[in-house]
């Protein structure tokens, strides 16, 4: 019998949640996802130094203003890392818009267009890129605009059913509902561990997946943020799962039969009327975990973006 990673690949598209080329080469995922924290981590690897130097050189041709140079370097570095990753995978790279723009639709759209242009100028077509945006109301509206322009989006930091519903109604290409961070919140609140089948994060993704399939939404569900392989195995059959290298290694070492837990019902239930802004805010607000985790996630990504900018500024 093959290992559980090999079996999972037959049920689900496996995505690598890393910016590290060596790990991607080793596990040969279909797609890869990055975020500000992963870009910061990757930027500290020696082999990435030329990518930073190249990004700095580019930024200096764009502006004489140091603050603008820092911004342009960070954007080009994310694209440079994305370009390197695309050499080793057949599918798409997800590159994230600055988390500090999470509540600004207009600036999120502008930043997304800029990142896509950088990829396009390097000869990379839109069908190999996903733009990551936080699943705020403003981020979802930005994605709605971008999707109509042929720029596919990955809506991240998704914790509530309200966020998932709004994303589907906006016609976004893909969502990344977080599993482990949901479990973290309930574990801290209730002071107990959860079996994988009862894991609140697993139950959240399962509910979203079934709702999408029952109502015929095309938005791809990509479970993210895993704490253990038990969570992953409980979501076997999900459209996609983005998994850190350490957990890919555990899956590769695990034996035993793996069965699909999520199955596409191919339903055609009538869809409800799209949520209004006020309905979205109220429904999301009713979920204390989601409110806290969305805000925390945006803050943490912004902190790591700031650290990256400080690192870049010191090199300019």
UniProtKB/Swiss-Prot annotation:
CDD domains: Transaldolase_TalAB (cd00957). It catalyses: D-sedoheptulose 7-phosphate + D-glyceraldehyde 3-phosphate = D-erythrose 4-phosphate + beta-D-fructose 6-phosphate. It comes from the Bacteria. It is an enzyme of class 2 (transferase). PROSITE patterns: TRANSALDOLASE_1, TRANSALDOLASE_2. The keyword Transferase applies. GO terms for molecular function: transaldolase activity. The active site is at residue 132. It is found in: Cytoplasm. Keywords: Cytoplasm, Pentose shunt, Schiff base, Transferase. Pfam families: TAL_FSA. Its EC number is 2.2.1.2. Pathway: Carbohydrate degradation; pentose phosphate pathway; D-glyceraldehyde 3-phosphate and beta-D-fructose 6-phosphate from D-ribose 5-phosphate and D-xylulose 5-phosphate (non-oxidative stage): step 2/3. Disulfide bonds: none annotated. InterPro entries: Aldolase_TIM, TAL/FSA, Transaldolase_1, Transaldolase_AS. GO terms for cellular component: cytosol. One of its GO terms (biological process) is pentose-phosphate shunt. Its main location: cytoplasm. Belongs to the transaldolase family. Type 1 subfamily. NCBIfam families: PRK12346.1, talAB. Homodimer. PANTHER family: TRANSALDOLASE. Transaldolase is important for the balance of metabolites in the pentose-phosphate pathway. This is Transaldolase. It comes from Vibrio cholerae serotype O1 (strain M66-2). The lineage of its organism: Bacteria, Pseudomonadati, Pseudomonadota, Gammaproteobacteria, Vibrionales.
């Amino acid at each position: 019998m093959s290992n559980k990673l090999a079996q999972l690949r037959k049920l689900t598209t496996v995505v690598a949640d890393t910016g590290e080329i060596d790990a991607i080469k080793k596990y040969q995922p279909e797609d890869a996802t990055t975020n500000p924290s992963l870009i910061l981590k990757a930027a500290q690897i020696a082999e990435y130094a030329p990518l930073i130097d190249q990004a700095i050189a580019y930024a200096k041709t764009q502006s004489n203003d140091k603050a603008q140079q820092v911004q342009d370097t960070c954007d080009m570095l994310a694209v440079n890392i994305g370009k390197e990753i695309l050499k080793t995978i057949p599918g798409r790279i997800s590159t994230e818009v600055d988390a500090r723009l999470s509540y600004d639709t207009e600036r999120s759209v502008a930043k997304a267009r800029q990142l896509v242009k950088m990829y396009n100028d390097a000869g990379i077509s839109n069908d190999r890129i996903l733009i990551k945006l936080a699943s705020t109301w403003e981020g979802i509206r930005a994605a709605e605009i971008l999707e109509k322009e042929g720029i596919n989006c990955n809506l991240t930091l998704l914790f509530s059913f309200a966020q998932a519903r709004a994303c589907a109604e906006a016609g976004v290409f893909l969502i990344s509902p977080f599993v482990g961070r949901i479990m973290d919140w309930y574990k801290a609140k209730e002071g107990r561990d959860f079996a994988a089948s009862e894991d609140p994060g697993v139950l959240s993704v399962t509910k979203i997946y079934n709702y999408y399939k029952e109502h015929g939404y095309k938005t791809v569900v990509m479970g993210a943020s895993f704490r253990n392989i038990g969570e992953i195995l409980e979501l076997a059959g999900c459209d996609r799962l983005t998994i850190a290298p350490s957990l890919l290694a555990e899956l590769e070492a695990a034996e035993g039969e793996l069965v699909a837990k999520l199955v596409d019902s191919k339903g055609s239930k009538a869809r409800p009327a799209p949520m209004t802004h006020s309905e979205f805010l109220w429904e999301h607000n009713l979920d204390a975990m989601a409110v806290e985790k969305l805000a925390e996630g945006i803050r943490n990504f912004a902190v790591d973006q700031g650290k990256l900018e400080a690192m870049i500024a010191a090199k300019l």
